[in-house]
């Protein structure tokens, strides 16, 4: 039986916002690794992935891709990151960015055994897209319940 969707009137929903972290400028995506650490990984448009733990940003980045990320104008730069469903065992994660040539790149990386740092030398390009325009490069990576990796693209 398919799931049933229901809507509640907005007046019945109690929503509140609380600032729990003042992240770095240009944060485009936030991900969790699903490894039980409760760390937040913040992807910044310039190509740096920062880690927040307990409401505090770590001084050292998780991964710095500024030497690979091209323009950070419009919908370009480091667009998204996602951790593999088996990240706790394999330490594999994916990033989606525009490179120095203007192409959109999906790349796989590995983290250190303790999960504290991403290894820039572990990069494996999975997909390169030559976009027809320099903007609307897309921007979201997700793993579905089926275990497949999904990415959105622009034009």
Regions found by a protein language model. Give the residues of each.
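Acidic, Gly/Ser/Thr-rich repeat motifs that build Ca2+-stabilized beta-propeller blades
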Residues: 1-155
